Design a protein with these regions (language model features):
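N-terminal helical capping/dimerization or prosegment-like subdomains
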Residues: 1-104, 331, 335
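Active-site metal-coordination/substrate-binding segment of hydrolases
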Residues: 63, 87-157, 438
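Acidic, glycine-rich active-site loops and adjacent beta-strand->loop/helix elements
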Residues: 96-98, 156-165, 188-193, 216-218, ...
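Acidic/histidine-rich catalytic neighborhood of metal-dependent amide-processing enzymes
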Residues: 121, 127-203
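Acidic-enriched catalytic cores of C-N bond-cleaving enzymes acting on peptides and small amides
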Residues: 193, 202, 223-315, 344-366
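Active-site-adjacent substrate-binding region
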Residues: 242, 249, 380-425
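A short beta-alpha structural unit
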Residues: 338-341, 368-384
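Conserved small/polar residues in nucleotide/adenosyl-binding loops
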Residues: 448-454
Length: 458
């Protein structure tokens, strides 16, 4: 491949065509169904589908066929089939639905307000995962421009990923005859440890999430009257949470949440730690004097990829401080998110956590745990020599540095399903969610110059 020609075409297409499309995409509040139950009626998802499909149809790619598939009562899916020069099939995946707004955006910025500043495009969804469809087709155009033979390419863009991809299995079954058996799966919904080389994700954590609720009263009572007699639902909540998490160290106390970490993954974590050093935690906006749970980069990488961790996402039953009167509240609820090792069973852990949280309620309080997420993690198959060579060649060619293999801490439900359906396929899971990207949070950003490594692999 002529690297200079590839870079030239990429820069031209990215600046003149793709960035303007991403700007329009960010303006649309097409939240995933879990965050917008009226997504179909509101029409935002359809607006994005139409935008993406229109752009794709304007690309001059030989033999490309595009269909927008709409199964009954399901979010839509964009399916693109591009014939190749060899028999192999490459499956490229992305999604177009978004996380909700989130608070804390800087002045002048917002989730649906695209701001282009210093090669950074701020707004919800650009890097997670709006760029995927544009990157996929641009990569193919680069190969066509240089007459480089390639495999058949199938692109699928779903609209339910941020809700757990619960619609996707139906589409995969619907399309099974068309999909065939891909030899390589490329997913553009992952991350990178830095922006200085190519990163490939070797594993993804599983997730069990739900709402823990503790009820002590039928209604609020004057705290001066009831406190000291009626137990605080917040105190009981803390007491119950201590059953699954050490309140000092944060270590998870549920044995079912742990697995043996493969030696190969430990070796890869050590290599990645040598590349990243303290950047593994310096990339986060820690408050002054705040410290990470460890200062050993290897342990932090393994914590983030192969060990369980509990996060508290939201709370119910607590008023805003400005509205907080002297009332002993009737209940407290909290949204929990337990990240799990890639090879653990989310179903088994979910059952165990429910049992631990709800048995023997303190003071006879009413305790419930309603699970809303239960997703297995994923571990990539052993990388084939040809793919490992391609990764390193691409990274050395464009960055003068080797590729890095590392586990990620988030979940992509689609990958576990694909691993089961295509056990012989190789996987390249990569993306632009690196330092400063802040996916799912405020001030989410896409770095507008960072897509070329993925294109080179295609």
């Amino acid at each position: 491949m002529d690297k200079d020609s590839a870079i030239k075409l990429t820069n031209e297409e990215w600046e003149s065509s793709i960035v303007p499309e991403l700007i329009e995409y960010i303006k649309i509040p097409n939240k995933s169904p879990a965050f917008d139950p009226n997504w179909n009626k509101n029409g935002y998802m359809e607006k994005v589908v139409e935008q993406f499909a229109a752009w794709c149809r304007n690309q001059d790619i030989k033999g490309m066929r595009l269909d927008v598939i709409r199964l009954p009562e399901r979010t839509p899916l964009i399916y693109i089939d591009i014939p190749g020069d060899i028999e192999n099939t490459v499956l490229l995946y992305g999604h177009l639905d978004k996380q909700p707004e989130m608070s804390g955006w800087a002045k002048g910025f917002g989730p649906w307000k695209p701001v282009l500043k210093n090669n950074k495009l701020y707004g919800r969804g650009g890097a997670d995962d709006g760029y995927a469809i544009f990157t996929s087709l641009l990569a193919i155009k680069i190969l066509e421009a240089q007459n480089i033979p390639r495999a058949r390419c199938v692109v699928i863009i779903e609209a339910c990923e941020e809700s757990g991809s619960y619609d996707l299995p139906f589409y995969i079954d619907h399309l099974k005859d068309k999909l065939g058996k891909p030899e390589l799966v490329i997913c553009l919904d992952s991350g990178c440890g830095n922006y200085d080389q190519l990163w490939s994700t070797t594993s993804l954590r599983g997730l069990v999430g739900g709402e823990l609720k503790i009820e002590v009263l039928d209604g609020g009572i004057h705290s001066g009257d009831a406190s000291g007699i009626v137990p605080s639902s917040f105190r009981l909540l803390r007491q119950i949470l201590d059953r699954i998490e050490d309140p000092v160290s944060g270590q998870i106390l549920v044995k079912d949440c742990y697995v043996e970490i493969p030696k190969k993954r430990i070796e890869q974590a050590k290599f990645a730690a040598g590349v990243l050093g303290n950047d593994i935690f310096n990339r986060f906006p820690l408050k002054e004097n705040s410290k990470p749970v460890s200062e050993d980069p290897v342990e932090l990488i393994l914590n983030r990829s192969w060990r369980p961790a509990l996060s508290y996402l939201g709370v119910g039953g607590l008023p805003e401080i400005s509205d907080a009167g002297n009332v002993l509240r009737p209940f407290t609820s909290i949204k929990l998110s337990m990240r799990l090792p890639p090879t653990s069973s989310a179903k088994k852990v979910s059952k165990k956590i429910n049992e631990i949280l709800t048995k023997n309620p303190p003071n006879g309080a009413k305790v419930s745990f309603k699970t809303d997420w239960s997703v297995d993690g994923w571990m990539a198959p052993e990388i084939s020599p040809w793919l490992e060579k391609a990764l390193n060649n691409a990274s050395e060619n464009y960055f003068k540095k080797p590729a890095v293999l590392m586990g990620e801490g988030w979940s992509i439900p689609f990958m576990g399903m694909l691993g089961e359906k295509f056990p012989d396929a190789q996987f390249l899971i990569t993306g632009v969610l690196g330092p400063g990207s802040n996916a799912h949070g405020p001030n989410a950003v896409s770095y507008t110059h960072l897509t070329l490594p993925t294109k080179r692999i295609v």
